[in-house]
Amino acid sequence: MQMSFNTKKCHVLHLGHRNTHYDYSLPKMSNIKKTSSSISYTYMFHQLEKVHDEKDLGVTVDDNLNFKLHISQKISKANSMLFLIKNYFQFLDAEMFSLLYKSLVRPHLEYASPVWSPTTKEDIKRIESVQRRATKLVPQLSQLSYTERLVALKLPTLEYRRTRQDLILLFNYIQQDIILDPSTNCKVCRNNSSMLTPITSGTRGHPFRFAIKRHTTVRNRFFTSRVLPIWNRLSTATVTANSLNCFKSGLRKDPSLPSPYIFTHDPASIISRRR
């Protein structure tokens, strides 16, 4: 006998502007009759509830696929932890703050970030504001600028860490799915259904560049649409690393990436770059 679904925990999440929003039902066992020779079952159909968002493996997915609800929830949890740290620790030095922040606050803002990484300036600033406010808890650093506080604490911006995590995930995928044919020096996909389309023409850039497909506003938030423009700008030495550790080391030195301590959406950093 197979385990049946708990219909009360099953929901329907409709995606897409043109979705027809059909009703869906699951069979639910309602009656069992046992005899000396057999067992008979009676089923009834349970209509599944329609929802606008659903949490799966710790990530809240909404019907617009913009993950604003998930981002708001994680910011709220991170702020709650900051409030506890501020109340329970009257004095924080740099070492103690780094330990508490990295273990209790930052994980809320980074868990599964390649899935929900924000694409709007508003959401990027909202997430970064948590770390901006947190770094002021160290009394000796509270009067410094945000960039100076990050340098003193050796904390990269959350924006930089999300970009780095995206690139690491893409590197791992490429190592498993894309190979370089030594006879033709062309890229070949091991899997015909690969989500990446190698660029076979042109001499500029590294040999593992991929085509950025046309996309709608919703698709613009997808992983490949977000990370491929950054990946294609990386240096050849970085993308041809023979191990993950070498790739991570290359990211720290790659000239195409911004400084890990400068928040690119900070007005002060924008002015300094223009000068």
Question: What are these model-predicted stretches?
Answer:
Residues S4-H52:
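Short, conserved micro-motifs composed of acidic
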Residues F45, L180-R226:
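Amphipathic alpha-helical
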Residues S40-T42, N242, K248-R275:
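C-terminal helix/juxtamembrane-tail motif
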Residues Q2-H14, D123-M195:
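Short, charged alpha-helical motifs in flexible N/C-terminal segments and linkers
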Residues M3, F83, N87-Q90, E110, ...:
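Charged/polar positions within long, soluble alpha-helices
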Residues L65-K74, Y88-L99, S117-I127, L155-R161, ...:
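Conserved, non-catalytic sequence blocks in retroelement Pol enzymes and Pol-derived host proteins
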Residues D56-N64, A78, V105, L109-W116, ...:
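Short, conserved catalytic/metal-binding micro-motifs enriched in Asp/Glu and His
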Residues F45-V115:
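Basic, alpha-helical interaction scaffolds
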